[in-house]
From Swiss-Prot:
It holds the Pfam family Fer4_7. HAMAP family: NDH1_NuoI. Its EC number is 7.1.1.-. [4Fe-4S] cluster 1 binds at C80, C83, C86, C132. NDH-1 is composed of 14 different subunits. Subunits NuoA, H, J, K, L, M, N constitute the membrane sector of the complex. NDH-1 shuttles electrons from NADH, via FMN and iron-sulfur (Fe-S) centers, to quinones in the respiratory chain. The immediate electron acceptor for the enzyme in this species is believed to be ubiquinone. Couples the redox reaction to proton translocation (for every two electrons transferred, four hydrogen ions are translocated across the cytoplasmic membrane), and thus conserves the redox energy in a proton gradient. Its cofactor is [4Fe-4S] cluster. It is found in: Cell inner membrane. Belongs to the complex I 23 kDa subunit family. It comes from Pelobacter propionicus (strain DSM 2379 / NBRC 103807 / OttBd1). Keywords: 4Fe-4S, Cell inner membrane, Cell membrane, Iron, Iron-sulfur, Membrane, Metal-binding, NAD, Quinone, Repeat, Translocase, Ubiquinone. It catalyses: a quinone + NADH + 5 H(+)(in) = a quinol + NAD(+) + 4 H(+)(out). The lineage of its organism: Bacteria, Pseudomonadati, Thermodesulfobacteriota, Desulfuromonadia, Desulfuromonadales. This is NADH-quinone oxidoreductase subunit I. InterPro entries: 4Fe4S_Fe-S-bd, 4Fe4S_Fe_S_CS, NADH_quinone_OxRdtase_chainI.
Length: 186
C-alpha cells in the first residue's frame, strides 16, 4: 500500500508534462547560441575556442602565479636549506630535492645538491612558497610559454630556477638579482 503524505504537492497534467520548463530551457540555450553566432559572424570575440599558437591570452589576473624562482644569498649560493617542507606540502608531488651536507658553513649545514620541479605535474597552487621557512622559493607573475613537445623540457633544474629572471615582477625584489632581467627558457 502506497503511503500518502499530507504535504505532498498535487500536480495536474500540465505540470507533469514539464512542457513550459522544456520550452524555457530551449529559449535560454537558443539565445546563447545565436548570440555567440552573431558575434562570430560580425568578427567579434564570442565564447569560441581560442586557437592557441596564433592567439595568446593577455587577460591574466594580477594574482597569477607563474614560474618558480630560487632566491640566493649574498655569497651566490641558493638560500634553500633542504628542509623538504615545500616537497612535503606539494599536493602534486612535483618537487624533488636531494640534500648535500656542507660542514664548512656553520650557519647552513645543508643545501640542495639537486632541486627540480616537474612542470608537467605542477598545479601552481603556491603552497611551496607559503611553506618555505627561509623564503627560498618564490613564484613570478610572468606567464611564460610552458607547453612543449617532450617532457624533458618540462623539468626545471636548480640552475634554471636560480638564474631565470622574470621580465617584470613588481611584487618583490629578488636577493642576488643584480643582473639585467632576461628570460631563459628550458
Amino acid at each position: 500500500m502506497k503511503k500518502e503524505y499530507w504535504n505532498k504537492p498535487t500536480m495536474d497534467l500540465w505540470d507533469r508534462l514539464y512542457i513550459f520548463e522544456v520550452i524555457r530551457g530551449l529559449c535560454i540555450t537558443g539565445s546563447v547560441f545565436f548570440g555567440n553566432m552573431w558575434k562570430w559572424l560580425t568578427f567579434r570575440k564570442g565564447a569560441l575556442t581560442a586557437y592557441y599558437p596564433e592567439e595568446l591570452r593577455a587577460d591574466y589576473s594580477s594574482a597569477n602565479r607563474g614560474r618558480h624562482l630560487l632566491t640566493t644569498r649574498a655569497d651566490g649560493k641558493v638560500q634553500c636549506v633542504s628542509c623538504n617542507m615545500c616537497a612535503t606540502v606539494c599536493p602534486a608531488y612535483c618537487i624533488e630535492i636531494q640534500s648535500a651536507a656542507d660542514f664548512n658553513d656553520p650557519f647552513h649545514p645543508k643545501s640542495p645538491d639537486r632541486f627540480e620541479i616537474d612542470y608537467s605535474r605542477c598545479i601552481f597552487c603556491g603552497f611551496c612558497v607559503e611553506a618555505c621557512p627561509e623564503d627560498a622559493i618564490r613564484m613570478s607573475k610572468d606567464t611564460p610559454n610552458f607547453p612543449g613537445f617532450d617532457r624533458e623540457n618540462m623539468w626545471a633544474t636548480q640552475d634554471l630556477l636560480m638564474n631565470w629572471q622574470p621580465a617584470s615582477d613588481a611584487a618583490k625584489s629578488y636577493p642576488g638579482s643584480g643582473q639585467a632581467h632576461q628570460e631563459v627558457h628550458p
